[in-house]
């Protein structure tokens, strides 16, 4: 067997790897680390995000947008997978460890505060 260590260019702990439609890879990690690869992981480019919280959960939604979850209740949303907007639900400061779209437009978040189900439309309305 052949194992190869990939150089991400980051010293951060990396927690989640997500393959997007079209094959692009995203990796999430400590302190708001978000890296992107368009060449099967051979090279990585950092993406700028509006939060320095650890990022743990990620999903590509049916509409093609991305939702990332992290420490301190941080949610990051992107329509294009390159620029992200910070969303936080009022009063929710727990870490979101997993993000899933259970049905089109219907989200389930899990974290140290348990499970939360809500619609994408509701999340967009309540974002801060």
Regions found by a protein language model. Give the residues of each.
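Residue-level hotspots at or immediately adjacent to binding/recognition sites across diverse folds
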Residues: 1-128
């Amino acid at each position: 067997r052949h194992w190869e260590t990939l150089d991400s260019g980051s010293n951060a702990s990396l927690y989640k790897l997500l393959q997007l439609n079209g094959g692009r890879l995203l990796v999430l990690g400590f302190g708001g680390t978000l890296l992107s690869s368009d060449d099967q992981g051979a090279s990585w480019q950092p993406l700028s995000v509006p939060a320095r919280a650890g990022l743990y959960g990620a999903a590509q939604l049916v509409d093609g947008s991305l939702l990332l979850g992290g420490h301190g209740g941080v949610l990051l949303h992107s329509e294009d997978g390159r620029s992200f907007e910070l969303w936080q639900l009022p009063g929710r400061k727990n870490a979101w460890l997993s993000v899933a779209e259970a049905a089109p437009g219907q989200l389930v978040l899990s974290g140290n505060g348990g499970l939360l189900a809500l619609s994408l439309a509701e999340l967009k309305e309540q974002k801060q």
